Amino acid sequence: GIFMLRRWELEWFYQEGASRLFPDAWEHYITAIPPVERHDLISAFHRRLTSDDKATRLAAAKAWSVWEGATSFLHVDADFVSGHEEPEFALAFARIENHYFVNGGFFEVEDQLLRDAPRIAGIPGVIVHGRYDVVCPIANAWDLHKAWPKAKLEITPASGHSAFEAENVDALV
């Protein structure tokens, strides 16, 4: 799915929004953070992912990583989710993502990707996005397509976020 790193996207997935579609996975995700810190989950996770305490880092990384793994497919893939629990993967995945998020993707402005889309306006391309992508809402692909009209927008009708879903694989390869 298309990710623009806009504030509303981060809030949708990591603060409130997707939580209403996956309350079971959400409950597991937020257990890593005390209730008094849940008003800003990305920052709360950042403090734990950069903690000096290895157990604290790992618990936060697993919660973060499993949250995304559990929401990436239209139909939850248990093997995919369990792969997100592996310590080495979880630590790398969560720390890299969170680092970019707390730093605004190192963009000059929030909507930099859309703002700079005219730079590739003359280049043909294909935008593939799962209709039921909860991680990166389809509005991102729609906005990019409007800003990049030479790109073909292919919405896979029975897919979520993962590039490993059959329809997404077919559209990408």
Region annotations inferred by a language model:
Residues 1-46:
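A catalytic-pocket lid/entrance helix-loop region that shapes and gates access to the active site
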Residues 36-39, 43-84:
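Accessory cap/linker subdomain of secreted extracellular hydrolases
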Residues 79-90, 117:
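Small-residue-rich helix-loop
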Residues 64, 138-152:
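Active-site-adjacent alpha-helix of alpha/beta-hydrolase-fold enzymes
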Residues 99-117:
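Active-site nucleophile elbow and catalytic-triad environment of alpha/beta-hydrolase enzymes
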Residues 108, 134-140:
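Conserved alpha/beta-hydrolase "acid-adjacent" motif
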Residues 135, 156-171:
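Catalytic histidine-centered segment of alpha/beta-hydrolase-like enzymes
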Residues 120-121, 127-129, 133:
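Short beta-strand/loop motif that positions the catalytic acidic residue
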